A protein has these predicted regions:
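Anion (oxyanion) recognition and catalysis
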Residues: 31, 190, 221-222
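Hydrophobic residues within beta-strands of alpha/beta enzymes
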Residues: 38-40, 109, 156, 196, ...
């Protein structure tokens, strides 16, 4: 018998630069779906490169916290609403992130790789003039750099995020092709007691699998990993609990 997933632990609202949805709309939709709880994980990506859309991934944390706590109280009889953050990891940000987590009592912290040496794979410029495989490898190497600098997150987000935006997506990608470095990432996370996220956004992007892919999740368990959270990475109400 299939078990229903009752929590969505990765979502965004208009407090994130890439979402226009009011927080209350996200909460109401999740409550209407019958979820037990949700966790907002608004983007905080200092040192984010310039983008064609001029996106600002800074985060007004006091305003975000105040709004969330107010709405969590208003919806307390319908759904539990937790206070999280998605940190856009880069090695030079480690100290400032550590200071932030000492100051602000987040319920849940995702650490994610969005920027690799000044480029976000979301944009084609990351892949221009290079082999797709080299771009994927650079992305995975950057995860190891980030973990070495900072390990205070609860989980590492969408470990193969880069595949969503590759020219061929996952048609030429597999766990086996990058096994050595992916195993190093997984072993390092396990040693540091950092979990991984099963991000169902991969289905939304047409991969036919979550991020990371199923074989990475299986390998994480084979290596002894025990911490797995599930989130849809929703930026709009229709993507809440997507493919759960």
């Amino acid at each position: 018998m299939d078990q229903k997933i009752l929590w969505d632990c990765h979502m965004h609202s208009s407090f994130s630069a890439d979402s226009d949805t009011p927080m209350e709309e996200m909460i109401q939709t999740a409550a209407d779906q019958g979820l037990t709880g949700i966790c907002f994980t608004e983007h905080f990506d200092p040192d984010y490169p310039d983008t064609p859309e001029n996106l600002d991934f800074s985060l007004n944390i006091p305003a975000y916290r105040q709004k969330l706590e107010s709405l969590a109280d208003a919806f307390k009889d319908q759904i539990q609403v937790n206070f999280g953050i998605e940190l856009g990891l880069q090695p030079q940000l480690a100290e400032s992130f550590s200071d932030l987590l000492k100051e602000v009592p987040f319920d849940f912290v995702i650490g994610s790789s969005h920027v690799v040496h000044g480029y976000d794979p979301y944009y084609p410029s990351y892949f221009e003039g290079r082999k797709e495989s080299a771009c994927y490898m650079e992305y995975f190497e950057s995860i190891l750099e980030n973990i070495a600098a900072f390990d205070e997150m609860d989980v590492y987000g969408h470990i193969d995020y880069v595949v969503r935006y590759g020219p061929n997506q996952n048609r030429q990608y597999s766990y086996g092709r990058y096994k050595e470095i992916l195993d190093e990432i997984l072993r390092t996370l396990i040693r540091k007691n950092v979990g991984i996220e099963l991000n169902t956004g991969g289905y939304h992007y047409g991969l036919g699998e979550p991020n990371p892919c199923v074989n990475i999740i299986r390998r994480y368990r084979e290596l002894g990993g025990e911490i797995i959270t599930i989130g849809a990475d929703a930026h709009t109400p229709d993507k809440i609990s997507y493919a759960f």
